[in-house]
Regions:
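Active-site donor-binding acidic/aromatic loop of nucleotide-activated sugar
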Residues: 102-105, 116-124, 130
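Aromatic "clamp/platform" in nucleotide-sugar-dependent glycosyltransferases that forms part
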Residues: 142
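Carbohydrate-associated surface elements
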Residues: 20, 40
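Membrane-proximal helix-turn-helix segments that form the acceptor-binding/catalytic region
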Residues: 1-14
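A conserved mid-protein helix/loop that constitutes part of the nucleotide-sugar donor-binding site
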Residues: 61-84, 94, 101-107
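Short hydrophobic beta-strand element within catalytic cores of glycosyltransferases
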Residues: 159-162
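A charged, aromatic-enriched C-terminal amphipathic alpha-helix characteristic of glycosyltransferases
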Residues: 184, 197-226
Length: 229
């Protein structure tokens, strides 16, 4: 905590990638002069790249988790919710991409839930290819700043469910979010997945581009170099 505070007080300007991050920087470390510059995403390019990898669905909905296999990512909750989702969608499939300390534990959980080949642990993957064979991304992190995974998923036109933490509510709509602190988190995730799967095609996504992000950052640097804030 002290190190972060000293670093921030020794800078001429701080940049946060979400309003939530900016608020935390001010509240926890007394940061001054914090400006918001969201992570950018080039929506047409991402959408086109994913469409080039698009694999038509042959069965039920295809759910994707694209994160580290570590406790703060909530993949155990996703497995429990997915096991119940199969009552509505027996042909549903869950791909858990990524690696981490919980790999063996999560695989054992999938076995206990009798999920069989409805779950694939795919390890390290090309995220564009993984999104091309998926219909929905679920991300149940304890904390996020401005998630590139969610930005890319929205740009690609995938359905999304995520925890209402960090910058996630600045990217997603209320019906795509669940309360990470809820005592009924598994059921909340299940209901959110059901609701998203029952909806039609997602609304067009708008966000700042990489070029806009770079321009905003350059503008901040230029003002600092001129001696202004």
């Amino acid at each position: 905590e002290t190190v972060h505070r000293v670093r921030l007080w020794g800078t001429d300007q701080a940049i946060a990638v979400s309003r939530s991050t900016a608020d935390q920087m001010r509240a926890k470390w007394g940061a001054r002069g914090v400006e918001l510059v969201y992570n950018g995403v080039d929506i047409p390019e991402v959408h086109a790249a994913v469409e080039q990898q698009r694999v038509p669905a042959e069965g039920g909905p295809r759910i994707l988790s694209l994160s580290r296999l570590s406790p703060e990512k909530g993949i155990d909750v996703l497995l429990d919710a997915f096991a119940q989702l199969r009552a509505d969608y027996p042909q549903a499939h869950l791909e858990i991409a990524g690696s981490g300390d919980l790999a063996s534990e999560l695989q054992a959980q999938a076995q206990r839930l009798n999920l069989g080949d409805s779950v694939t642990f795919s390890g390290f993957v090309n995220p564009i290819e993984a999104m091309g064979r998926s219909d929905m991304i679920v991300q149940l992190s304890v904390w996020e700043n401005c998630s590139y995974t969610l930005l890319d998923a929205k740009a690609a036109g995938l359905k999304t469910v995520a925890t209402a933490v960090g910058g996630n509510p600045e990217i997603l709509g209320a019906d795509e979010l669940v309360d990470r602190q809820s005592a009924t988190l598994t059921q909340d995730v299940l209901q959110a997945m059901r609701a998203q799967l029952q909806k039609g095609k997602p609304e067009p996504f708008t966000w700042i581009s990489n070029e806009q992000m770079a321009a905003q950052t350059v503008d901040i640097y230029a003002r600092v170099l001129r001696g202004g804030r």
